[in-house]
Amino acid sequence: MWTIYQHHKGMHYLTLGKALHSESMESQAVYIALYDNPHNSMWVRPSSMFFDNGGPRGGKRFSPLAVVRKLALNESERILGFGYDAWGDGRTQSQFVESYKTNINHLRGQRYVLETTDGGILSTVNTLRLTADTVGLAWLATHPEHRKQGHATILMHAVMALLRHENPDMTFVLHSEIGVRYFERFGFEKASVEHQHFEKSVAMVAANDSEPPSLDGLLKEFF
């Protein structure tokens, strides 16, 4: 579980935990900026500066905004209804939710959620480990009552940052059903024509390397 903080000027930061200074033993906050950070650099600052009241008029410099965590499979019914209006395909909502009990991508994926600090789920995204260095992102959805508030964007930035913290060479792929513009903000580009296999979606890739690795048919299957 990771907490996202909002700076008093509006920027978002993902905390990775705390560390101790090797000489003074002073507590340090370890975090990643979720903006203007193409190399996914980690930063540290004394915890006293992170959690103090150094903001305007004595307010908090950083305030807890939301929590990112992995979703357990047995919690799935809490989020599956989020996608019903987009992917229901004429089924009842109960039929739609029931279908995921045998959906291979749902069962093999690791979902992440963005929650309020009191546990209300706002957005979710599924991650599929396709190779050691490639993750497919799918099923990005927000609770209908909380849409158009930037929650999915925060979750995408956070999940990509966490996975690149694990592996700096991580490449991400996805199939966009909403065009390319939204996902370009996360560094995605339209994949070359040989990777475009589905009429109603656009295959996209985001790689840290200037030369993305071979996708080797990874985008032939819709996920």
Question: Language-model segments: which ranges?
Answer:
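Mixed-charge, low-complexity intrinsically disordered regions
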Residues: 1-67
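A structural microfeature
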Residues: 17, 122-123, 192
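Short amphipathic alpha-helix that is part of the acyltransferase structural core
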Residues: 66-99, 106-115, 120-121, 208-223
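Conserved beta-strand in the GNAT
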Residues: 113, 119-129, 133-141
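A short, internal acetyl-CoA/4′-phosphopantetheine-binding micro-motif in the GNAT/acyltransferase core
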Residues: 140-148, 178
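Conserved acetyl-CoA pyrophosphate-binding loop and the N-cap/start of the following alpha-helix
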Residues: 146-158
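Conserved active-site alpha-helix within GNAT-family acetyltransferase domains
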Residues: 168-170, 177-200
